């Protein structure tokens, strides 16, 4: 898993929230406009892969599949 994808998935633990809006997820990219575009693309990909769920109004949650993928990545 690439570093930016890991940061996006770890955002839920960082903010200690079950759901995050897109602007909070953009924080994973810092202040770099190119990174914000990359975060947007990553979020779309993670939704398609079932790792994030769209909750409406630009809010997203980490699915059980996403939690498992993140845990597996952290353990090697």
Predicted segments — roles?
Residues 47-57:
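A short, conserved structural fragment
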Residues 32-48:
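Short amphipathic alpha-helical interaction segments
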Residues 1-31:
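Short amphipathic alpha-helical interface segments
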Residues 3, 7, 41, 61-64:
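Amphipathic alpha-helical interaction segments
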Residues 57-69:
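Accessory beta->alpha helical hairpin/"wing" motif in late/C-terminal subdomains of nucleic-acid enzymes
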Residues 73-76:
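Short, low-complexity, charge-dense intrinsically disordered segments
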